[in-house]
């Protein structure tokens, strides 16, 4: 099973099992994962499981997404151990 480990600005971690094929991340209520930091857009990102792989997609957020320190455009694969940064 895939899982997402969320670490906030203060170093607190939360483990979220990825049981759905599509998960939205953002500041607005109604997202599967809600992050309340100001640098997170209302609808910031989407995680998609497809054919045994996981992808993250930037939903035209203002502050973007980085995978292993590199800013992505559109959609990018996410592998075990990758570090994803939402916002700046």
Question: At which residue positions do the language-model features occur?
Answer:
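Forkhead-associated
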Residues: 3-5, 12-87
């Amino acid at each position: 099973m895939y899982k997402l480990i969320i670490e906030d600005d203060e170093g607190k971690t939360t483990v979220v099992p990825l049981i759905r094929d599509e998960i939205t991340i953002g500041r607005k209520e109604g997202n599967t994962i809600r992050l309340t930091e100001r640098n997170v857009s209302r609808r910031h990102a989407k995680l998609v499981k497809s054919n045994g792989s996981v992808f993250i997609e930037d939903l035209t957020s203002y502050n973007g997404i980085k995978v292993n320190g590199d800013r992505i455009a559109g959609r990018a694969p996410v592998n075990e151990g990758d570090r994803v940064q939402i916002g700046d």
